[in-house]
Each structure stands twice: as structure tokens, then as C-alpha cells.
Amino acid sequence: ELDELVAPVLALQAYLSETHDEAFLQERFVQDGLSLILARLREARHPDTALYETFLQPTDDEIVHPYLTYDNVLVWRALQLLADWRPAQRGSLLAEADAVRAAIFTHCVKKDADGQPYFAWSVDLAGHHDVYDEPPGSLQLLPYYGFCERTDVIWQNTVRMIRSADYKFSFAGKPIAEIGCPHAPWPWVLSLCNSLLCGHAEQALRELTI
């Protein structure tokens, strides 16, 4: 599972940001773990395109297509962090991070019937994609990870789609106007957490008082 593979890298960054415990970063078991993550990442990479595949979605449900936009954003961020921590590999890791970012915009951005761009949930690199979102790993969090700004039109269109009443798993217009998914077909608490982080904090805080 791609999101779980890179999660320790993001968790390590959170720990270092709070503690400034640089000695921990140099512990042998930490460095061995980071090396193992990089090795596993190489196994998941498409041979010709800088996208990484997964076999399960963030909910642990089966995928529709193997290349998830959200998961690859996590890979992009993890590669940036690893570049900061591994000076000898900095150039190659940053180059790969840039390649992943470019591949996401090339292959994971689609257009709706009006020609407006949005981030697909997943793609297969053969022309197929799906419009979807999951609270455990939401496309709403892309600005939170620094992948784009909240002013990014592609991201704004994406959020508008999945929060719209037209989207199958949206609870727009309901007392808790959040997002569900087949794994949990109701407004998840995780969706409230996403709203707190993605620019809908006022709404989420109001819903938490219901």
C-alpha cells in the first residue's frame, strides 16, 4: 500500500519539526528504514513514467486503477523530505520528486464536460480514470501537503466536484455536509478532519457542535 509505505517519512518529519531531534534521524535503524522505503518505492514505479502504483486505496479497499493521485502526491512529498535528509542523494531525489509532480499534472489531470480541469482520483495510463475521493486520503489535502495552493483552479474544481450534491458520496445540504465512500457510506469524522485542514474549518467546527 503506497500511502502506508511513505507514511513513516511524513511522520518522521512531523516528529523532527516538533523536537528538532536530529540525532534520532541519524540512528542506524532509522536510516535503514528509510533505505528500505526507497527500495520498495523503486519496485512500485512505472518503468517509463514517474508514477507509483498501489494495490489498495487509503481505506484498504481494492483499487479501480493502480495510480492514485493522492498517493503519488505523498510520494512527491516523501522524496522531497528524503532529499533533505540524504545529501548524497539530494540531486537524484529532487529530480524524481519533480518528475512525479510533472507526471501527476500530465496524467492525473482530466477535464469535465465543460472543459474544466480536475484531479482524477486514479488512472491506469491507458486513458481510464475515475472521479472519487476517500476521507482517509483525500484530494482535498493536496494544499496541506504543499503540492498546490488553495487558489489552484484544478484543485478548486476537484473539491467543488466531490463536495457537490451531484457526487454520489457527498452529503452536501445535509446537517453534516461532508464526504463518505463505499467503505463508510456516511459523513466520516475523517472527512471533518479534512475540512479543518483544507479551508472549510468554519463549517467543520459548526458541524462538530451538532
Regions found by a protein language model. Give the residues of each.
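Active-site lining segments of carbohydrate-active enzymes
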Residues: 1-9, 14-44, 53-58
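Well-ordered alpha-helical scaffold segments within catalytic/enzyme domains
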Residues: 7-24, 74-88, 140-151, 191-207
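C-terminal catalytic domain of Rieske-type non-heme iron oxygenases
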Residues: 177, 205-210
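Extended ligand-binding clefts on enzyme/binding-domain cores
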Residues: 28, 32-39, 43-54, 65-76, ...
